[in-house]
Regions:
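Conformational coupling and interaction surfaces
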Residues: 86-239
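Active-site histidine-anchored catalytic micro-motif
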Residues: 3-117
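Short intrinsically disordered, low-complexity coil segments enriched in acidic
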Residues: 1-4, 153
């Protein structure tokens, strides 16, 4: 993808380290204005939490997060309990550190493997995408075997991270998602990254997602496909 589409970055060695970039972006943001969407391992977020005052900002990592972040959205875990790759596949200690040390005044929403793993999107890309679509190319190269159909873990998480539960009306549809719980928290086994939801009425800042009542996997796949194939020149989301 990097070699086939125009880009401003020419040399990856000139990029900032992840924590430096996080601290710089958060420092320049308005208070409580940033959603962080995590669709991979949690190592960089753990390092952000451990970061200290520096030349970029005098606040510690947790204080900077509390001041600038409105919500953390995580593609990770399996609900109400289980094992999932983003939590346990590479750095389970980081998973446990982030989940256990994330500031209590900043909500966390989890999109689990059981949710996106049952929604197969991308089928419409080959027939309906603009021919120069980087989304089409990404799916063709990654999925392979003349297919663009794939599970929707990351796209679904990203869509929620952008719109939340209440923002879908901005694109003319009802929210296909809902919170699966009113209270409770994620408990992580640091040795392997497995998780289990603990019902605790005193904890109300953590949620995991489910499909809204009456919503099917296929209807969410259709919605994602419409966004994948949408021409960015067209200001309308749906015709």
């Amino acid at each position: 993808m990097a070699y086939n589409w125009p880009r401003t970055l020419q040399d990856a060695s000139t990029t900032s380290e992840p924590v430096e970039l996080y601290r710089s972006l958060l420092s320049s943001a308005d208070d409580h204005s940033m959603n962080i969407i995590s669709i991979g391992f949690l190592t960089n977020l753990a390092d952000l939490l451990r970061s200290k005052s520096d030349d970029v900002n005098s606040m510690s990592g947790p204080d900077l997060i509390s001041a600038k972040v409105s919500e953390l959205v995580v593609m990770g875990g399996y609900y109400p309990s289980g094992w999932e790759f983003n939590f346990g596949g590479e750095d389970p200690d980081a998973t446990a550190y982030v989940v256990e040390n994330w500031p209590k005044d900043v909500p966390i929403t989890y999109s689990g493997g059981e949710l996106g793993g049952e929604i197969f999107s991308g089928q419409s890309l080959t027939e309906h995408s603009p021919p120069d679509s980087p989304i089409l190319a990404a799916y063709q190269w990654y999925v392979g075997r003349c297919s663009t159909l794939r599970e929707s873990w990351d796209p679904l998480t990203t869509l929620y991270g952008i719109l939340g539960l209440d923002g879908f009306e901005r694109i003319g549809v009802k929210s296909p998602l809902a919170f699966a719980n009113e209270f409770g928290y994620n408990s992580i086994t640091s040795s392997n990254g497995s998780n289990a939801w603990v019902n605790d009425s005193s904890v109300t800042n953590q949620h995991y997602l489910r499909l809204a009542d009456g919503v099917s996997n296929s209807s969410v796949a259709w919605l994602l496909d419409q966004l994948y194939i949408h021409d960015p020149i067209d200001e309308r989301c749906f015709s």
